[in-house]
Regions:
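Short, well-ordered alpha-helices that flank and scaffold nucleotide-derived cofactor binding pockets
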Residues: 69, 73, 158, 187-190
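Conserved strand-to-helix beginnings and helix N-cap segments that scaffold or border functional pockets
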Residues: 65, 93-94, 157, 178-182
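Glycine-rich dinucleotide-binding loop and its adjacent helix/turn
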Residues: 10-74, 162-177
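Acidic donor-binding helix in nucleotide-sugar-dependent glycosyltransferases
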Residues: 70, 82, 184
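An active-site-proximal "capping" alpha-helix that borders the catalytic cofactor pocket
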Residues: 180-192
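Well-ordered alpha-helical segments embedded in enzymatic catalytic cores
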Residues: 34-37, 155-156, 184
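Short, hinge-like loop/turn segments at secondary-structure boundaries
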Residues: 20-21, 96-99, 184-187
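A Rossmann-like FAD-binding core segment of flavoenzymes
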Residues: 1-11, 27-28, 40-42, 49-51, ...
Length: 192
C-alpha cells in the first residue's frame, strides 16, 4: 500500500527565524487560523474573516497571495507579513510575480517583508522588524492567518504499517515542493 495522505497547516507560528521559541505567544487565540481553513472560510463567505486580516507568510508561495487577493477584492484590509526579504519570493521562480504583485498593490494590500509577529492579542498584534528597533502594533485585527509550517498526516500509515507492506509518499514524509514529490513518486513506482 502506498500512502500519500499529505500534511496539515499548523497555527503555532513556529519558525526557523525564531528557533528559540516553539510558538508565537497568543497563537491559540480564536482570531488565529491556518491558511487552508481561512481559504475555505473566504470561499464560503468573502467577509467571513472580518474586515482587517493579517497573513503571516513564511512559504513565499502563491497561496497567501491568492488569499490576500480574494480578501482585498471584497474590500477587506489585508497585510502580508514575512520574515523573508520579499513577499511571494517563489512567484519569481514560477514567473507569476509580474502579474500577481501589481494586482495586490492595486488592491492596496500592505506588504511587510523582513518583519515578524512578536505576539498576538485578542484584536491586535505586535510586529517587529527583523533587523531591530521597537515593535509596532496593528490594531482592530479580525484574523491572523498562518501560512508557515505543516505537520504530516501519517496516522493511517502508522496504524497499518505493521500489517501490510506500506510506503510513504509526498508531504506525509515532509512537506515540500511538488517537483520533489513528483520525482519521489516516480522513483517509488519504478522501485516497486
Amino acid at each position: 500500500a502506498v500512502f500519500a495522505t499529505g500534511a496539515r497547516w499548523t497555527t503555532t507560528g513556529y519558525s526557523p527565524y525564531r528557533p528559540e521559541r516553539s510558538n508565537i505567544p497568543g497563537c491559540h487565540l480564536p482570531i488565529v487560523m491556518d491558511i487552508k481553513t481561512a481559504i475555505e472560510v473566504v470561499l464560503a463567505s468573502p467577509d467571513g474573516l472580518g474586515k482587517n486580516v493579517i497573513i503571516l507568510d513564511e512559504t513565499g508561495e502563491y497561496l497567501p497571495l491568492g488569499l490576500a487577493e480574494l480578501l482585498a477584492d471584497s474590500k477587506i484590509a489585508v497585510e502580508i507579513i514575512s520574515p523573508r526579504s520579499f513577499i511571494g519570493a517563489d512567484t519569481q521562480r514560477t514567473l507569476d510575480m509580474p502579474y500577481v504583485m501589481p494586482r495586490l498593490k492595486n488592491l492596496n494590500v500592505r506588504l511587510s517583508p523582513l518583519h515578524f509577529i512578536e505576539e498576538i492579542y485578542e484584536d491586535s498584534i505586535s510586529v517587529y522588524d527583523i533587523w531591530g528597533g521597537e515593535p509596532t502594533y496593528r490594531t482592530d485585527v479580525s484574523a491572523v492567518i498562518m501560512a508557515m509550517t505543516q505537520n504530516p498526516n501519517d496516522a493511517l500509515y502508522s496504524e497499518v504499517k505493521e500489517h501490510v507492506l506500506a510506503y510513504k509518499l509526498g508531504d506525509m514524509i515532509a512537506p515540500r515542493r511538488i517537483e520533489a514529490i513528483i520525482y519521489e513518486a516516480e522513483k517509488l513506482g519504478r522501485d516497486i
